[in-house]
Amino acid sequence: MKLLKPTWVNHNGKPIFSVDIHPDGTKFATGGQGQDSGKVVIWNMSPVLQEDDEKDENIPKMLCQMDNHLACVNCVRWSNSGMYLASGGDDKLIMVWKRATYIGPSTVFGSSGKLANVEQWRCVSILRNHSGDVMDVAWSPHDAWLASCSVDNTVVIWNAVKFPEILATLRGHSGLVKGLTWDPVGKYIASQADDRSLKVWRTLDWQLETSITKPFDECGGTTHVLRLSWSPDGHYLVSAHAMNNSGPTAQIIEREGWKTNMDFVGHRKAVTVVKFNPKIFKKKQKNGSSAKPSCPYCCCAVGSKDRSLSVWLTCLKRPLVVIHELFDKSIMDISWTLNGLGILVCSMDGSVAFLDFSQDELGDPLSEEEKSRIHQSTYGKSLAIMTEAQLSTAVIENPEMLKYQRRQQQQQLDQKSAATREMGSATSVAGVVNGESLEDIRKNLLKKQVETRTADGRRRITPLCIAQLDTGDFSTAFFNSIPLSGSLAGTMLSSHSSPQLLPLDSSTPNSFGASKPCTEPVVAASARPAGDSVNKDSMNATSTPAALSPSVLTTPSKIEPMKAFDSRFTERSKATPGAPALTSMTPTAVERLKEQNLVKELRPRDLLESSSDSDEKVPLAKASSLSKRKLELEVETVEKKKKGRPRKDSRLMPVSLSVQSPAALTAEKEAMCLSAPALALKLPIPSPQRAFTLQVSSDPSMYIEVENEVTVVGGVKLSRLKCNREGKEWETVLTSRILTAAGSCDVVCVACEKRMLSVFSTCGRRLLSPILLPSPISTLHCTGSYVMALTAAATLSVWDVHRQVVVVKEESLHSILAGSDMTVSQILLTQHGIPVMNLSDGKAYCFNPSLSTWNLVSDKQDSLAQCADFRSSLPSQDAMLCSGPLAIIQGRTSNSGRQAARLFSVPHVVQQETTLAYLENQVAAALTLQSSHEYRHWLLVYARYLVNEGFEYRLREICKDLLGPVHYSTGSQWESTVVGLRKRELLKELLPVIGQNLRFQRLFTECQEQLDILRDK
């Protein structure tokens, strides 16, 4: 054995409370007290191991120093992969560090340039939950969890895959928790506290397995830490500070029955730290060959307040070596090298000691295969503790399952090789970043410098900071980084997780109500029918550019046809009638229209009075009693306008639908919020215009022109309808004035006075006799062969004019508007004739013709979207751009909710439940909207999440429904298709998803065999 105390490892005389050696053995970290802050220092291991390297001035001893902790650092621990370093301190924080390969060294802050950081380490996540000093941190054996304990009497389990998510908070100690340790396979975690107890917790459900108190009855809270340790074979757990016959010991606790019959004795004062060697050894004979009946044993180091260190072998009754007065103060921490032959010890006196053993002294270490067999004999092969490596060695019973597994492994190898190439190209100083050399990047930055001339002609150049370029070694472990105010934080994924996905921009407003709801919606402007146009802002916010609504424009009576597409007259919307996306008119726009004399002041009128210029009168039953309570808003327009091109600021903006309110008007000029009265609903009626033009679509080019009150022979006035499609024009005349128009690539329809609705083909042929509406028209829409009419009485009808069938028959909006001050802000008619109403409160309802019910398909205030997290279940980035009616309705609201949820800790169980509920809502909404590609997308995401989380019952139910009966039965109610998709084809798409998890290979085999039987039939 060799003993060394490197004097250059110090914290400038301050205490060192923790030490840990990197898994690759090239460096080690120390944590302790700094100058007015906590200090974490990363040191080079080579000068400790080799005397020549220590003397070589070209070999740096200190690699990096971090002073980010606000108070003393009590513990530093490397992850088992060596990628991350966790540190906990008296500032109640746990910081997770990761190396960042910058170009060139930097100096330590406050060192006047004397100390240089050879390596750059940055804090990638700050974990905040403890209310007291953090005493110890520990990574689980497979880096899936990070545990921390504190003087607040709690142990917190963090999800190391998704920092800062908290999986569990273990409460049970009544004193300061000062030590943590995991068992070798991560099945248990043990904690020791000042309440004279040691508790063992199960990781399966995070519940208490056992509490051991007898060996600690005589103990007092005299130690700064209580670092206990679990043996690498899993058989023994050794505690810190215990007492036996009033003498300090390290208590040995057997896993079998948690018996406490043995202990390590000999120290004169309380034991502060126990650390097992990571290797399991077997005895070595003198001739160099291992003994045949060799029994494996472990090695353990014990440190005490008596400043001495003892090293024990479990095959010996006495310690292998004892070193007295190794330090001037208490031993605080111990760390073994990964090969098991070296040990670092730190003390409160601010010094470090290194002990180097030989194999002759400790024995021959067992191989990893032999170590794994010992673990299996101790813990078994429970799926609850099986790692990915163990699953990969499991027996695969199906050759198709093997094919999917090999394909998945090949994808992982391709990703790793790509990441390796990126890291290799970033190591050289003259490397390339994104296809551009670093020198070129610096030159391009210099080109952007700002140069000005002073009054006397001298040049003045504004200094430009050229930051050091961070070129590596960032792996795909990070999904996203969300900056926190005043701190550095980020979310982290393991290197085995799904490929990195680009987060959607949550700042983009929702095309279907994602922006702030208008609290004061206005009625339709007289210059155009309500709800028939879309402004540029709403088009930019729409997630699918192929689904926009037509544009209505107000023009002089004699407008030239092609000028309808000029930017001076229209908003150049690339509209198709498939899915209108409307926005509300703001009060500012209303005031601007009033200033241009395009809109007169609003005035109340009797509810039961017919619309202006209508020849039909409604009988007045109780006019005297109702006239004071029921009001109607009428908007009139000034027909005397200047000839020629309208002013730029006088263009009309899209207007939202609003529902009539029974409340009395307090001021005529005040914009009113119209709500649904208890007795009746009243929607605004478009006023007749002299002329207007409607752009139906841009591809193919199609627009409609309407001209009212065209004088013919004999003084008779008619209305003219013109349609131009790709240069081919047709026109027809009607006897009544046209109030509003709509069109699609299949039909053109107009609503006239006297409640008449006329439908024409795109060639001008009348398809139906005029339809008499139950009340005056309010809004008209067309999609394909479907025509939707929303009347002033808030009744909705949808017809399929080609098949001449009714889809929705005079359905009232009372059920979705009654009882509150809500307004209809936007309307959508899907390609399958499903009407969707988006309300001002952010909720969207669609009418289900099969059930004759209004179904909720979207809610902007949905809390499920804020907690749901299914990033790992998304197949690719392209899948996130799934378009359709559901995507238009919801926009990007759900993504912003998930981004916001990352800033707050959500328990894993709660997040699991909310994610399942959210995905099931998405599948049901896509089914209700009859959107086949969205239904397929969300079904695959839902199934992938079930596979990842291990929900076999729900997954099996989905497979059973998609498979159907194998043998045909006349009484079977099973439908072979869903929203136009074949169920069994969907099941074939699910099989590769199921095949990614070996736990479901039985389900995979069952489904595949039954599909083969059906195929043979």
UniProtKB/Swiss-Prot annotation:
Q: Which residues carry this modification: Phosphoserine?
A: 111, 549, 557, 584, 610-612, 614, 661, 675, 687
Where is it made, tissue-wise? Expressed at high levels in kidney, pancreas and skeletal muscle and at lower levels in brain, heart, liver, lung, and placenta.
Q: Where is the composition biased (Polar residues)?
A: 536-555
Where in this protein does the record put region Interaction with histone H4?
738-1017
The entry describes its oligomerization and partners as: Interacts with histone H3-3B, PAX3 and PAX7. Interacts with histone H3.Y. Interacts with CCNA1, HIRIP3, NFU1/HIRIP5 and histone H2B. Part of a complex which includes ASF1A, CABIN1, histone H3.3, histone H4 and UBN1.
Q: What does this protein do?
A: Cooperates with ASF1A to promote replication-independent chromatin assembly. Required for the periodic repression of histone gene transcription during the cell cycle. Required for the formation of senescence-associated heterochromatin foci (SAHF) and efficient senescence-associated cell cycle exit.
Entry protein name: Protein HIRA
Say which species the protein is native to. Answer: Homo sapiens (Human)
Question: What taxonomic classification does the UniProt entry list for its organism?
Answer: Eukaryota, Metazoa, Chordata, Craniata, Vertebrata
